[in-house]
Amino acid sequence: SSKKPQKPATKTVTAGRKASLTGPVVNVPVWRASTHLYENVAELEAGKGRNEDGRFFYGRRGSPTQWSLADALTEMEPGAHGTMLYPSGVAAIACSLLSVLKAGDILLMTDNAYDPSRSLADGFLKRFGVQTRYFDPRTTDYDALFCDRTRAILLESPGSLTFEMQDIP
């Protein structure tokens, strides 16, 4: 059956609804839990790592509330093929950088970046062979920053501590 396209306002209030997540209620209830109880060990083992099927295993891996929100955001964003939610900004930054960087690559990062992002670059990424080059966020010569090993650039505008605004070309 062909579904009539929804208006943006309708999509906003209905996106992410799945009967498998909502049960008899209209919207997914808010799950405030990190741990889920199982009737027996066999049920626990069957649930491990299977969040993709909508089965709650452990809060850090998501919950029906989070899956519903991710589905809703994907539905509302034209051309999106999936949404990832993270519990913190640095977790999102780490996942994004780890998805594109490999040993030998260079990461460009503004010198006013959030301290946990700098710690990630100077610690974790460095141990895996990724070099980070910091630059003045007020630069006007972005071309001079790049070389053949540059794989990613992390910009913060405004900067988290100094609030400099970058003029990104």
PLM segments and residue spans:
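Buried hydrophobic positions in well-ordered alpha/beta secondary-structure cores of metabolic enzymes
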Residues: 24, 73, 92, 107, ...
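Conserved PLP-anchoring active-site segment centered on the Schiff-base-forming lysine
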Residues: 99-116
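Short amphipathic alpha-helix with an adjacent loop that forms part of the alpha/beta core around
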Residues: 139-150
